[in-house]
Structures are given as structure tokens and as C-alpha cells.
Curated annotation (Swiss-Prot):
Disulfide bridge positions per record: none
Free-text cofactor note: Binds 1 zinc ion.
Cofactor: Zn(2+)
This enzyme's EC code(s): 3.1.-.-
GO molecular function: metalloendopeptidase activity; RNA endonuclease activity; zinc ion binding
Phylogenetic classification of the source organism: Bacteria, Pseudomonadati, Thermodesulfobacteriota, Desulfovibrionia, Desulfovibrionales
Protein name, per record: Endoribonuclease YbeY
Top EC class, one word: hydrolase
Species annotation: Nitratidesulfovibrio vulgaris (strain ATCC 29579 / DSM 644 / CCUG 34227 / NCIMB 8303 / VKM B-1760 / Hildenborough) (Desulfovibrio vulgaris)
Length: 162
């Protein structure tokens, strides 16, 4: 079991291309496909103003970005050792180890999708997979690309299975 905690301080979630009620399932599929089952992830849905403020305060960078990733650990965490299979194990009231926190700007997501000529939902899944890869300890490169592809494909499978 995995858990996603969603915060929407800017009331921007309505602009997501994936319904808020479906985001947890998307993350669960991504985590299962990439060996990160059994962790909690925090997701903050932001606008450009909020993500720009966090970007400057936390990273010293000026301006908005698409997604920020804040791993809970200095190194990739160990998988919870008990041989759990995806979708089994702890119930919703059990404490799970925190993998990390993500901040997604809906404004930048939509702007980039338009500029890149991509479907907004596809770009959203790509950004969420990218952020998940960073909090799992991956940096840019071939391993990150493989991680992102596995996560994105799993998320797409859950979206088309409905």
C-alpha cells in the first residue's frame, strides 16, 4: 500500500487534467511499477506564485518551475522489507515512511503542455513521474528516463483501465 497526501492551498486542483479523486490511484500505480510501494508521498498543488516563492526560499532560484521535489532522505530509501506485493499490506491508518514531497504548478504545467504541443494529461503524468523519480533518489540521465517511462506507463494503464 502507498499513500498520497494532497494539499491544495491555492485552490488550483480543479485545473488539473486528472481528477483529484484519481490522483492517488495514479501515484499508487507509479509507485508499484517502480518498486516504491509502501511509502507516503506529499503533493502540493500550486499556482505559479506559490511555486516561485517556494523555489526561491528553498532553492534560491527566481521564478516559477513545473515541479519541485524534496526527498525525505539524503539517499534513496530502503524498500520496506517484508515482501509486500503491490496493493497489499498496511491499511490506511498505518504509518508509512515518507518518501518525499512534491510541489506541482498547474499554471506551468498547462503553459508547457501548450508550448510543447502535448496533451495536458500526458504532460502532467510526465511531470509527476519526474518528480517521483527525484524523491526516489534519481538524477537526470538514462536511469531517470527509464524510471519515468515505467511510472508513466503504469499510470496510463490505470487511466485506460477505467
Amino acid at each position: 500500500m502507498s499513500r498520497l497526501l494532497v494539499d491544495d492551498p491555492c485552490r488550483a486542483a480543479w485545473r488539473l487534467p486528472i481528477a483529484l479523486r484519481d490522483i492517488s490511484g495514479v501515484f499508487a500505480a507509479m509507485q508499484c511499477a517502480t518498486g516504491l510501494e509502501g511509502f507516503e508521498v506529499e503533493l502540493t498543488i500550486a499556482d505559479d506564485a506559490l511555486i516561485a516563492m517556494i523555489n526561491e526560499e528553498q532553492l534560491g532560484c527566481i521564478g516559477p518551475t513545473n515541479i519541485l521535489s524534496f526527498p525525505a532522505y539524503g539517499a534513496p530509501p530502503d524498500y520496506p522489507a517484508d515482501g509486500m506485493e503491490c496493493g497489499t499490506g498496511q491499511d490506511a491508518h498505518t504509518s508509512l515512511p515518507l518518501l518525499g514531497s512534491l510541489v506541482l504548478s498547474v499554471d506551468t504545467l498547462r503553459r508547457e503542455a501548450f508550448l510543447y504541443g502535448q496533451p495536458v494529461q500526458e504532460h502532467c503524468l510526465r511531470l509527476l513521474a519526474h518528480g517521483l523519480g527525484h524523491i526516489a533518489g534519481y538524477d537526470h540521465g538514462a536511469e531517470m528516463e527509464a524510471f519515468e517511462e515505467a511510472a508513466r506507463e503504469a499510470a496510463l494503464a490505470t487511466r485506460t483501465a477505467r
